[in-house]
């Protein structure tokens, strides 16, 4: 099994040396590593150059897209059986992270696997709870049969640390070329629809979290709303996340009451920001383009958007 590891980068910052060191320590080392950089001004590219089997490709930051840029990187490696994606701020937690992730491909019907994400050591209480809630200590393999029980969680996938079977990835035409985010969920949904299975491997662990402000959470959920407005078939076929959202808020309040009660007002403000951002994102076509760009975390996405581009992405 030939493995390629792909990392999109842009000014990777202080965590980057730790990310690279963790890759070097893997018991299964990738046959090829690709860093696709969007014009970093720091030491991102020079530091990556020391990795074994590394290829570095440069693109203009204005050309970056969560789907299209990853597709471009996949096209640079023609002989890989498995493609692993890692983000520049995700640190492999132990030397067997890649080994445990790719183990699932021994089942020919499993087309994608994502790993568990634990919070960084500097994570605030909201970030700690989010990772503990969303990333269980129990592994699971999901198929069409799980949709009734799991709903949209059936197609949960995160390219912060995820692997894809190359043959199925290409069979389904890769990620959408122009998407604001959630290219990983999009692909997992296509795989499930096509009769394949996707897995969550709790034994393949990375450290990855964000201490987002309420404003940043608003922006992130605005983008999530835009994604679902552009790809409504996912919620139509797999269900919404309403019930899961209520469970998250209840769990968060319980966690904070026990561990960090002074964070409850911040949590309530953040919850409102998420809700408002998502609702506005779902109706982005009713907003001026300048407002969409202002509300969005991924601002360059809006450079080539027109209101006539309401065609469903599928």
Curated annotation (Swiss-Prot):
InterPro entries: Glyco_trans_2-like (IPR001173), Glycosyltransf_2 (IPR050834), Nucleotide-diphossugar_trans (IPR029044). GO terms for molecular function: glycosyltransferase activity. It holds the Pfam family Glycos_transf_2. Keywords: Glycosyltransferase, Lipopolysaccharide biosynthesis, Transferase. Signal peptide: none annotated. Coiled coil: none annotated. It catalyses: alpha-D-galactosyl-di-trans,octa-cis-undecaprenyl diphosphate + dTDP-beta-L-rhamnose = alpha-L-rhamnosyl-(1->3)-alpha-D-galactosyl-1-diphospho-di-trans,octa-cis-undecaprenol + dTDP + H(+). Rhamnosyltransferase involved in the biosynthesis of the repeat unit of the lipopolysaccharide (LPS) O-antigen region. Catalyzes the addition of a rhamnose to the galactosyl-undecaprenyl diphosphate intermediate. Belongs to the glycosyltransferase 2 family. This is O-antigen chain rhamnosyltransferase RfbN. It comes from Salmonella typhimurium (strain LT2 / SGSC1412 / ATCC 700720). The lineage of its organism: Bacteria, Pseudomonadati, Pseudomonadota, Gammaproteobacteria, Enterobacterales. The gene is rfbN.
């Amino acid at each position: 099994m030939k493995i390629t590891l792909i990392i999109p980068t842009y000014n990777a910052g202080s965590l980057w040396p730790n990310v690279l060191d963790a890759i070097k320590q893997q018991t299964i080392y990738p046959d090829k590593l690709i860093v696709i950089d969007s014009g970093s001004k720091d030491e991102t590219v020079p530091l990556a150059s020391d990795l074994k089997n590394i290829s570095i490709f440069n693109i203009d930051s204005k050309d970056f897209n969560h789907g299209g840029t990853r597709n471009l990187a996949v096209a640079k490696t023609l002989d890989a059986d498995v493609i692993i994606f890692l983000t520049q701020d995700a640190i492999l937690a132990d030397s067997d992270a890649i080994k445990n992730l790719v183990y699932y491909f021994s089942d020919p019907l499993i087309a994608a696997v994502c790993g568990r994400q634990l919070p960084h050591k500097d994570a605030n209480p909201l970030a700690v709870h989010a990772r503990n809630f969303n990333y269980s200590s129990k592994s699971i393999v999901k198929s069409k049969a799980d949709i009734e029980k799991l709903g949209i969680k059936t197609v949960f996938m995160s390219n912060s640390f995820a692997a894809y079977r190359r043959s199925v990835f290409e069979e389904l035409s890769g990620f959408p070329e122009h998407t604001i985010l959630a290219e990983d969920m999009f692909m997992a949904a296509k795989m499930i629809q096509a009769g394949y299975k996707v897995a969550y491997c709790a034994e393949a662990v990375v450290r990855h979290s964000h201490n987002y402000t309420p404003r940043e959470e608003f922006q992130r959920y605005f983008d999530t709303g835009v994604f679902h407005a552009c790809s409504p078939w996912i919620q139509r076929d797999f269900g919404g996340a309403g019930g899961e959202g209520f469970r998250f808020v209840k769990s968060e309040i319980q966690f904070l009451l026990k561990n960090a009660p002074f964070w409850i007002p911040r949590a309530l403000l953040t919850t409102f920001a998420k809700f408002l951002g998502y609702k506005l994102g779902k109706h982005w076509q009713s907003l001026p383009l300048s407002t969409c760009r202002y509300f969005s975390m991924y601002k360059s996405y809006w450079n080539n958007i027109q209101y006539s581009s309401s065609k469903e992405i599928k």
